[in-house]
Amino acid sequence: MNVIEALKAVKKLLQNPNHWTKGANARDINESSVNGSNPEAVKFCLIGAFDKLQWHYEELSTIDNYFAIADAKNYLRNAIGSAFISDFNDNSTHKQIITALNKAILLAKKENIQ
């Protein structure tokens, strides 16, 4: 996995507004707050989506993928103009979330990051 693939995977996970949440990393079908890595999570904030990507898929739990995901978060921080991804998530609309992910993808592509 590379930075762009990580950002696209998070975008795919959050594309449906019903799979996005605020105020918690993730939620289960009962709307209870859970960790993004919890297999019962069905809704995710931005950070929870990155957690799912890193820890839910065993094949992605490698050191290289860890760094790709960390770098992807940094591109997202640049895209939103803030170090606080959770605050951005909780104070934004779903449309703003997808727009920020698109911007982060474009920034990574512009810098030819893989």
Tell me the role of every PLM-derived stretch:
Residues M1-Q114:
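Domain-length accessory/inserted modules outside core catalytic folds
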